A protein has these predicted regions:
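Nucleic-acid endonuclease domains
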Residues: 1-77, 81-170
Length: 170
């Protein structure tokens, strides 16, 4: 669970991130009022996944990043890199892309997530890249929903009218 001190850091990160990325979000026709909320939720989901994995014995390269990058330096890299579990180091690191799902979305669509249709992993999935779906339980608490390897995803059009997105329903 996220404590107050970490929540305030996440909130500050989300404010700075949403301000630095406003043009990017507008190009994708995203509601600017929801950007801050989605940014907070995404980062909380990342920390919840990180703590869950650490508690289960996984070795993670570094905690979630709270740095703000300029537009030309933003990447689509994994949110986390898992290098092993307990005393075993993986030969091939596991790249984890964390997707947070609100409770209402979970209620309406089950364990699912959206991604930009032009995302690199859609065209070029890799067997060491995974999606981790984190489901909202409260403002500062998410639970693990499901893992899926990027090579196993069956992409579909979203049930909502979102032409630039693809959906994965698990």
């Amino acid at each position: 669970m996220i404590d107050y001190k970490l929540f305030k850091k996440i909130e500050k990160y989300a404010q700075l991130h949403s301000q630095s990325s406003i043009d990017h979000y507008r190009k994708r026709n995203q509601n600017t009022d929801k950007i801050l909320i989605n940014c907070i939720a995404g980062k909380i989901g990342e920390f919840e996944c990180y703590y869950s994995m650490i508690n289960a014995g996984y070795k993670i390269k570094s905690p979630p990043d709270l740095a703000i990058y300029p537009d030309d330096d933003k990447s689509h890299a994994a949110d986390m890199i898992c290098v092993g579990k307990n005393d075993i180091l993986y030969e091939n690191e596991k790249h984890i892309h964390i997707k947070t799902v609100s409770f209402n979305t979970f209620k309406n669509y089950g364990i699912s997530f959206l991604i930009e249709a032009n995302d690199r992993l859609v065209k070029y999935p890799k067997d060491n890249h995974f999606y981790s779906v984190m489901i909202e339980e409260s403002l500062t608490s998410y639970r693990f929903g499901k893992w899926i390897c990027s090579t196993d995803v069956i992409w579909m059009p979203p049930k909502m009218n979102l032409p630039s997105k693809l959906a994965c329903y698990l």
